[in-house]
């Protein structure tokens, strides 16, 4: 399962929420590893449905959310790899969370700006580290959030982005500008951009979940057919549970 939150969202109350840190729109320093309860009964449900491995990621309240990992549904040694991606989000999730607080990002403009600013900051941080060389006195102050972005800039992991049809071209533009790999997660409306998404900066499209209700605007098109359209164009495609 290429997009899941099982083990980190035990119920629908704040006390059961351990993968969605709705306090700052930029939380790249976080790691889903520390929010997972390996004894969560949802792992048993996953096994029953044939899901042996999940990409467990922080929730999508923030523009940059934190690292995600690959994790087995059962067994003694369950962590496969951490990180596998840096989770990010565009559209209604960060807009909805922070508009209620009367703070940025309330618009898609602000989301794009914050995402680009973070990536610029990571590149600047990397340049300062490189310029310092072996001189520890010239190194910039250690910043875990910026450190978590270095594998993205180096194309070792993708930026894994919650994105619907109103955000896909913006995300592709950002991926090209910073020469990074991205996955487009949820991706409702991708059939409108099938040709454009067949781009080397798009590591993959993770569609779904297929059972969610339609909602106005960006979530108003549940186009299952995009999976075949993208596959025909050589795009890596998966279907998520969003568990």
Regions found by a protein language model. Give the residues of each.
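Metal-associated gating/positioning segment near the N- to mid-region
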Residues: 1-58, 63
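Divalent metal-coordination and catalytic microenvironments
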Residues: 3, 46, 171, 230, ...
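Glycine-enriched alpha-helix->loop->beta-strand junction motifs that scaffold or abut catalytic
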Residues: 175-182, 198-206, 233-236
């Amino acid at each position: 399962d290429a997009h899941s939150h099982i083990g980190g969202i035990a119920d629908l109350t704040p006390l059961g929420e351990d993968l969605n840190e709705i306090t700052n729109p930029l939380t790249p320093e976080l790691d889903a590893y520390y929010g997972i309860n390996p004894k969560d009964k949802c792992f048993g449900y996953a096994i029953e449905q044939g899901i042996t491995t999940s990409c467990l990621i922080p929730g999508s309240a923030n523009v940059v959310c934190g690292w995600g990992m690959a994790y087995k549904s059962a067994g003694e040694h369950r962590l496969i790899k951490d990180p596998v991606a840096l989770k990010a989000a565009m559209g209604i999730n960060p807009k909805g969370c922070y508009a209620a607080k009367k703070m940025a990002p309330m618009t898609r403009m602000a989301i794009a700006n914050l995402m680009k600013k973070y990536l610029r900051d990571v590149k600047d941080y990397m340049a300062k580290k490189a310029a310092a060389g072996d001189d520890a006195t010239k190194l910039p102050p250690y910043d875990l959030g910026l450190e978590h972005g270095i594998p993205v800039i180096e194309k070792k992991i993708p930026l894994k982005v919650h994105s619907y049809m109103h955000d896909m071209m913006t995300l592709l533009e950002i991926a090209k500008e910073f020469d990074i790999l991205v996955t487009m997660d949820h991706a409702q409306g991708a059939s409108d951009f099938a040709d454009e998404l067949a781009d080397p900066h798009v590591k993959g499209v993770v569609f779904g979940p297929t059972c969610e209700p339609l909602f106005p605007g960006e979530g108003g098109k549940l186009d299952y057919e995009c999976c075949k359209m993208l596959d025909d164009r050589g795009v890596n495609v998966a279907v998520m549970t969003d568990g």
